[in-house]
Design a protein with these regions (language model features):
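Terminal low-complexity segments of carbohydrate-biosynthetic enzymes
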Residues: 1-3, 282-407
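Acidic donor-binding/catalytic loop of UDP-sugar-dependent glycosyltransferases
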Residues: 52, 138-142, 146-163
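Short beta-strand-to-loop element that shapes/binds the nucleotide-sugar donor at the catalytic cleft/hinge
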Residues: 169-189
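Acidic donor-binding loop at a coil-to-helix junction in glycosyltransferase catalytic cores
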Residues: 236-243
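N-proximal low-complexity "stem/linker" segments adjacent to membrane-targeting elements
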Residues: 1-63
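Catalytic donor-sugar/metal-binding loop of nucleotide-sugar-dependent glycosyltransferases
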Residues: 236, 248-263
Length: 407
């Protein structure tokens, strides 16, 4: 499976490393010039990052027996200053000649990324390269660690690389995390965002969704065979982590690790059109008007209760498809394409177990999010802090279970 993926779907850097030819000119680093075998690989994309921050991060991994694949990149349409700063970063990183880092240049002229593919392509380049090195025997572990330049790695971060999965389809693992900042307002914004995301994931879990997990690229580890099976990272300028895990969930487990927790610097960023950076910007703007944070809104709990009803209705349909869905739920699921899905499946000979799997593959993480957002038309958003303070005990316990903010 891995060989087939690398041959047919991998990016050029990985195919070159896996072949008999010399490494392409945009790859550099001492590990390319020796034969050391590492415990595992860690992939970090970097665009318009400060050298000091990245140097500190890379240095912290020096004794971990981890080969870091650093993909220094810039989209073709980035502003000239960001491109110039990223190229200067590339120059400074090259000067260090780290013994444990391979640098991929996707920031120089002729090498920059398609803006529509952005960070998704950057992650894919790095992970494809890690996969090729694993196949070539340069790494022992099947786990591919992924992170970002704003993460502080705790002691024990690389311990996962020493574990042996029970099955080849081991899926993905999610590290717990919390956002922090030396700026009090930004720190509080990071806390609110972590609470919002933990509340959302807990709501999915309460509803019985199998897509109840965080989707943050800097906190993911993917098993090599699983990564190949889903054909790697989607080439997207944002949301690549969400879509990768959405694909993995249909094939293998996505599990949250008990620890260690990653500390992620809360940063207002315009690198991507949506995600953590833009969300933090909106929260900071909100805090300027209401420093208490009470006016920061999140989903109404009844959205998740309605999701639970929908999932139970789909389970009943899988057992007895001759009994059609009815009422408001049918309308909401039809708006997501359920009628076409059910009609297509009805033309096949299927068992209840097969229908159950198919319907939950169809009603995936993306459709779940779309369903929750559609519920906002009847259950308006409300204060996150007030919601968390007034949740029933079981729901509050579940939020605590998924809580990423350690204070």
């Amino acid at each position: 499976m891995i060989e087939r993926y690398l041959e047919n779907y991998a990016e050029p850097e990985a195919r070159a490393v896996g072949g008999a030819h010399a490494a392409p000119a945009n790859l550099n680093g001492r590990p390319l010039r020796d034969t050391r075998v590492w415990q595992g690989c860690l992939v970090i994309p970097a665009f318009n990052e400060a050298f000091e921050t990245l140097h500190r991060q890379l240095t912290s991994m020096r004794s971990a027996d981890v080969l870091v694949i650093l993909v220094i990149n810039a989209p073709e349409n980035a502003n000239p200053k960001a491109i110039a700063d990223t190229r200067m970063l590339l120059y400074k990183i090259h000067e260090q000649d780290y013994e444990h880092v391979i640098v991929v240049d996707r920031a120089s002229n002729g090498l920059r990324l398609n803006p529509k593919q952005g960070v998704g392509l950057a992650r894919k380049i790095g992970c494809d390269l890690a996969l090729a090195l694993r196949l070539a025997g340069r790494a022992r572990s099947d786990w591919l660690l992924q992170s970002d330049a704003d993460v502080f790695f705790p002691s024990g971060y690389s311990d996962l690389l020493h574990t042996i999965p029970v099955t080849d389809s081991a899926g993905a693992r999610i590290f717990p995390h919390n956002h922090f900042s030396s700026d009090p307002t930004l720190h509080y914004a990071g806390q609110l965002y972590d609470q919002h995301m933990s509340y959302y994931v807990a709501g999915l879990a309460m509803a019985g969704s199998r897509y109840a997990h965080h989707s943050l690229g800097s906190t993911i580890a993917v098993h090599a065979k699983t990564y190949a099976a889903v054909r790697g990272y989607p080439k997207r300028s944002a949301g690549e982590d969400f879509y990768l895990l959405n694909k993995i969930c249909k094939l293998a487990p996505v599990e949250r690790l008990a620890g260690p927790a990653l500390s992620i610097e809360a940063r207002i960023s315009a690198r991507v059109p949506f995600g953590t950076g833009p969300a933090l910007r909106k929260i900071v703007e909100n805090l300027a008007k209401d420093p208490s944070g009470d006016s920061y809104l999140s989903y109404h709990p009844d959205c998740f209760r309605l999701l639970g009803r929908a999932l139970r209705a789909l389970d009943r349909w899988a057992v007895a498809p001759q009994n059609p869905l009815q009422g408001n739920l049918l309308g909401r699921l039809s708006a997501l394409g359920f009628d076409g899905f059910a009609d297509g499946l009805s033309k096949q000979q299927t068992t209840a177990e097969q229908r159950h799997r198919s319907v939950h593959d169809w009603f995936d993480g993306l459709k779940t999010l779309q369903f929750i957002r559609a519920c906002q038309d009847i259950y308006g958003d409300q204060s996150l802090t007030h919601t968390l303070a007034n949740l029933e005990s079981a729901f509050r316990t579940k939020v605590f279970e998924f809580q990423t903010n350690n204070g």
